[in-house]
């Protein structure tokens, strides 16, 4: 049986890490695409040469022409300008919007049946633009944000409680930015809700509030430490988890940026929500109950995303048609 084909648009730090993880997880053959001459070919060759060492069979190829992604089962988009110190995700809007329009056109022509995962920031606006530009069904175009933000929250909680990350569940809703909504009430350690652990004296509300804020600042913290570039290991692993759930029909419940169609009282907007990811893409959106405070935070996050989309439409009015 033919192996799946995974196309990675952008061969930078995230793209290279995606290619490594996809191969090691035996998800399929990998094509790295990048406009930088020689870079995708060089990384593909380097990766191909590690396959005998790691003992897996995957074909790696690099290209600077969109026809190389023809027939891809999964397309993961990282193309665009990365954040620099002092730069917000929103500062990237005008530059990366043009990139999404070009990438969307390439996907529409060469990989119209693919499951598309967008990583490019500002995430919620870029995945919206990518879906509009590609014309693919909304359930086949998602953004990677919530898996990463939730992983950061889980890691910080595991550190706080001195337990394995495997025993911590948590998820983050809303936009991928300063207004994201880490849901402490739905976070657990070994099945025990974090609010109960606060009452048991394991931690304090103040320490959990600090963890919530650190989660919101997670990307910026790494950007400031690196001085040049942004996070790439955890974002790549998060996108691969989404791709694996689709390719293997695992039906994992993952927080992703999905297009809402009435869920949470919203329509025609991409925002982070828990969803079932299987062979049909986004198979179901999970509507969790939000209390008044959580809903207020979620609404603020949605408003921030709506502002970005409006800014996109001013730059590229054609996307609204």
Curated annotation (Swiss-Prot):
Its EC number is 1.1.1.37. GO terms for molecular function: L-lactate dehydrogenase activity; L-malate dehydrogenase (NAD+) activity. Signal peptide: none annotated. It catalyses: (S)-malate + NAD(+) = oxaloacetate + NADH + H(+). NAD(+) binds at residues 10-15, 34, 96, 119-121. Substrate binds at residues 83, 89, 121, 152. GO terms for biological process: lactate metabolic process; tricarboxylic acid cycle. The active site is at 176 (proton acceptor). Pfam families: Ldh_1_C, Ldh_1_N. Keywords: NAD, Oxidoreductase, Tricarboxylic acid cycle. PANTHER family: L-2-HYDROXYCARBOXYLATE DEHYDROGENASE (NAD(P)(+)), L-LACTATE DEHYDROGENASE. Belongs to the LDH/MDH superfamily. MDH type 3 family. Catalyzes the reversible oxidation of malate to oxaloacetate. HAMAP family: Malate_dehydrog_3. This is Malate dehydrogenase. It comes from Xanthobacter autotrophicus (strain ATCC BAA-1158 / Py2).
């Amino acid at each position: 049986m033919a192996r799946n084909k995974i196309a990675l648009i952008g061969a930078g730090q995230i793209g290279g890490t995606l290619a490594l993880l996809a191969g090691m997880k035996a998800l399929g053959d990998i094509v790295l695409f990048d406009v930088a001459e020689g870079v995708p070919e060089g990384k593909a060759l380097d990766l191909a040469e590690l396959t005998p060492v790691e003992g897996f069979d995957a074909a790696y190829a690099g290209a600077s022409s969109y026809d190389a992604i023809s027939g891809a089962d999964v397309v993961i988009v990282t193309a665009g300008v990365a954040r620099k110190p002092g730069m917000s995700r929103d500062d990237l809007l005008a530059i990366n919007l043009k990139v999404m329009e070009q990438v969307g056109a390439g996907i529409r022509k060469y990989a119209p049946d693919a499951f598309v995962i967008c990583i490019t920031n500002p995430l919620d606006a870029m995945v919206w633009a990518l879906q509009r530009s590609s014309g693919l069904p909304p359930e086949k175009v998602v953004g990677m944000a919530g898996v990463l933000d939730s992983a950061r929250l889980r890691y910080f909680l595991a550190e706080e409680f001195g337990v394995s990350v495997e025993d911590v569940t948590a998820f983050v809703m809303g936009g991928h930015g300063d207004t994201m909504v880490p849901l402490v009430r739905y976070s657990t350690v070994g099945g025990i809700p974090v609010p109960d652990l606060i009452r048991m004296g394991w931690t304090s509300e103040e320490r959990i509030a600090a963890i919530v804020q650190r989660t919101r600042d997670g990307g910026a913290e790494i950007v400031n430490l690196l001085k040049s570039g942004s996070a790439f290991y955890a974002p790549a692993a998060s996108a691969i988890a989404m791709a694996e759930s689709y390719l293997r029909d695992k039906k994992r419940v993952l927080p992703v940026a999905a297009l809402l169609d009435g869920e949470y009282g919203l329509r025609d907007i991409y925002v982070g929500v828990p969803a079932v990811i299987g062979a049909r893409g986004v198979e179901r959106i999970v509507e969790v109950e939000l209390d008044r405070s959580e809903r207020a935070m979620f609404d603020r996050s949605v408003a921030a995303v709506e502002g970005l989309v409006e800014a996109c439409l001013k730059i590229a009015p054609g996307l609204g048609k």
